[in-house]
């Protein structure tokens, strides 16, 4: 993808390398995909929500819960769906026995039958930030993981 920054630095064209939206950073792929503060409030959130929507749709299908045939038409609601001792919550505060600061992940799959819980909180970092982002999410939800385990065992 040829950005203004590439046109200026590689092709030596006389163009302004700054992002036209924020006018603060050079318009690089990294900036467009995950760094522009003007896109942060809308496009990044929209991308995050679409991924959560798709994951929620897939999870419900795996548990044979009826859903729309097209994932993009699926409308997850912050509610609990229960089927065979399995609950799937979407953007819902998790109720546990102890006070937990981070208690609202994107999706939680609670399988009481198997004694397992899956906590999903989506982040979409650039490749270079993947390990840091994963570690941050793990740390953020560690207390919720422990409290949830205690509730189902």
Language-model features and meaning:
Residues 23-24, 37-40:
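Cys/His-coordinated zinc-binding microdomains
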Residues 23, 44-61, 65:
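Metal-dependent nuclease catalytic cores that hydrolyze phosphodiester bonds in DNA/RNA
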């Amino acid at each position: 993808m040829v950005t203004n920054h590439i046109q200026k630095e590689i092709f030596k064209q006389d163009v302004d390398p700054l992002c036209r939206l924020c006018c603060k950073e050079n318009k690089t792929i990294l900036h467009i995909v995950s760094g522009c503060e003007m896109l942060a409030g809308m496009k990044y959130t929209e991308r995050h929500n679409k991924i959560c929507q798709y994951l929620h749709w897939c999870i419900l299908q795996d548990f044979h819960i009826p859903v729309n045939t097209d994932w993009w038409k699926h409308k997850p609601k912050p509610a609990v769906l229960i089927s065979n001792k399995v609950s799937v919550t979407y953007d819902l505060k998790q109720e546990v026995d102890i006070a937990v600061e981070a208690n609202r992940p994107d999706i939680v799959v609670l399988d009481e039958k198997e004694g397992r819980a899956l906590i999903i909180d989506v982040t979409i970092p650039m490749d270079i930030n993947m390990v840091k982002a994963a570690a941050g999410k793990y740390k953020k939800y560690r207390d919720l993981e422990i409290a949830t385990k205690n509730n189902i065992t």
